[in-house]
UniProtKB/Swiss-Prot annotation:
GO terms for cellular component: cleavage furrow; cytoplasm; cytoskeleton; cytosol; lamellipodium; membrane; perinuclear region of cytoplasm; plasma membrane. Involved in regulation of the actin cytoskeleton. May regulate WAS actin-bundling activity. Bridges the interaction between ABL1 and PTPN18 leading to ABL1 dephosphorylation. May play a role as a scaffold protein between PTPN12 and WAS and allow PTPN12 to dephosphorylate WAS. Has the potential to physically couple CD2 and CD2AP to WAS. Acts downstream of CD2 and CD2AP to recruit WAS to the T-cell:APC contact site so as to promote the actin polymerization required for synapse induction during T-cell activation. Down-regulates CD2-stimulated adhesion through the coupling of PTPN12 to CD2. Dephosphorylated on Tyr-345 by PTPN18, this event negatively regulates the association of PSTPIP1 with SH2 domain-containing proteins as tyrosine kinase. Phosphorylation of Tyr-345 is probably required for subsequent phosphorylation at other tyrosine residues. Phosphorylation is induced by activation of the EGFR and PDGFR in a ABL1 dependent manner. The phosphorylation regulates the interaction with WAS and with MEFV. The F-BAR domain is important for filament formation. The SH3 domain is not required for filament formation or localization to the uropod. It is found in: Cytoplasm; Cell membrane; Cell projection, Uropodium; Cytoplasm, Cytoskeleton. It comes from Homo sapiens. The modification Phosphotyrosine is found at Y345. This is Proline-serine-threonine phosphatase-interacting protein 1.
Length: 416
């Protein structure tokens, strides 16, 4: 026998900012709530029909004559009228029983709604907290990397000036290099702190997600059990009330006997599973741990730790013009000048990152606000509709809105 599948193992999403699995489960519970209402409406209308039918039978029996008949036929006719009245009364009683079942289902549905709302509130809180801290961590990372680049540039400038510059220029350059280094150190501290906070919230969200999945599976189990039993009881009530229709209701019972709650849950999970693993933690990336590949085999030139540069303007999909990328693509190596042999310079390879063209253009919606940082970027407001022209692998997408083109972060968009 296969082990019972669990919601908590099958509704994850690798995208750190997406909550697809939770949304699928929540929709399942909402669909189940609608099913409860449909069952309630069925019982309500059947109770009304049984009540009308019972009252009409009682009225027919009481108005029937037969007083002119005598002896055994009179007794038989009187018995028929009495039994017809009894049948009518039993149908009226059945209507009352169906209304009791209806009230029980309504109370069950409301209890499940209250329980679901509690878990929804908790999940909304942790999801918003996770997304907020993720955005903060990414901004801290961006600032940290920029400060590191500034510190490297200032250090290189100081080394050049110290070789043949004036004393004041050397001191000024040295002070600037020291300030840039301090700024980079502070940015690194903020970045580490942001990652630590994000990991704490991520762990809390993951635990809440598991707990919510377990609660939702229990609710689904209870709902299926209650509805299955309600169908069973309703079928038995109608079967006992109308023996002549027993064959039809027997078919219902045979069908209900083949109903398996476990099989229903397994089938749903297999059809709608969104993944078996939660998103991986966001790692801390040290700026100076990146691999630098020298493009020259000259033994006189060694790689300099911390001399890494990022030429974002030469990459397709980054917020720079493609003409700059084309003109810079031919420059593959940077070599030190002969008169600077006493300095240490590292040749840096530049790879051209190809973008994924979105052909034909597709419409996307902005999820968050974004303020352009460069002239070739576009401002975004949550809810804006845009056409994606090019999807850059570095995360910057070329979009068009109202005749204007520019770059925006791809993670801020969702496909319509």
């Amino acid at each position: 026998m296969m082990p019972q599948l669990q919601f908590k193992d099958a509704f994850w999403c690798r995208d750190f900012t997406a909550h697809t699995g939770y949304e699928v489960l929540l929709q399942r519970l909402l669909d189940g709530r609608k099913m409860c209402k449909d069952m309630e409406e069925l019982l309500r209308q059947r109770a009304q029909a049984e009540e009308r039918y019972g009252k009409e039978l009682v009225q027919i029996a009481r108005k029937a004559g037969g007083q002119t008949e005598i002896n055994s036929l009179r007794a038989s006719f009187d018995s028929l009228k009495q039994q017809m009245e009894n049948v009518g009364s039993s149908h009226i009683q059945l209507a009352l029983t169906l209304r009791e079942e209806l009230r029980s289902l309504e109370e069950f549905r409301e209890r499940q709604k209250e329980q679901r709302k509690k878990y929804e509130a908790v999940m909304d809180r942790v999801q918003k907290s996770k997304l907020s801290l993720y955005k903060k961590a990414m901004e801290s990372k961006k600032t940290y990397e920029q400060k590191c680049r500034d510190a490297d540039d200032a250090e290189q400038a100081f080394e050049r000036i110290s070789a043949n510059g004036h004393q004041k220029q050397v001191e000024k350059s040295q002070n600037k290099a020291r300030q840039c280094k301090d700024s980079a150190t502070e940015a690194e501290r903020v970045y580490r702190q942001s990652i630590a906070q994000l990991e704490k919230v991520r762990a809390e969200w993951e635990q809440e997600h598991r707990t919510t999945c377990e609660a939702f599976q229990l609710q689904e189990f209870d709902r299926l059990t209650i509805l299955r039993n309600a169908l069973w009881v309703h079928s038995n009530q109608l079967s006992m009330q109308c023996v002549k229709d027993d064959e039809l209701y027997e078919e219902v019972r045979l069908t209900l006997e083949g109903c398996s709650i476990d099989a229903d849950i397994d089938s749903f999970i297999q059809a709608k599973s969104t993944g078996t693993e939660p998103p991986a933690p966001v790692p801390y990336q040290n700026y100076y741990d990146r691999e630098v590949t020298p493009l020259t085999s000259s033994p006189g030139i060694q790689p300099s730790c911390g001399m890494i540069k990022r030429f974002s303007g030469l990459l397709h999909g980054s917020p720079k013009t493609t003409s700059l990328a084309a003109s810079a693509a031919s420059t593959e190596t940077l070599t030190p000048t002969p008169e600077r042999n006493e300095g240490v310079y590292t040749a840096i390879a530049v790879q051209e990152i190809q973008g994924n063209p979105a052909s034909p253009a597709q419409e996307y919606r902005a999820l968050y606000d974004y303020t352009a940082q460069n002239p070739d970027e576009l401002d975004l407001s949550a809810g804006d509709i845009l056409e994606v022209i090019l999807e850059g692998e570095d995360g910057w997408w070329t979009v068009e809105r109202n005749g204007q083109r520019g770059f925006v972060p791809g993670s801020y968009l969702e496909k319509l």
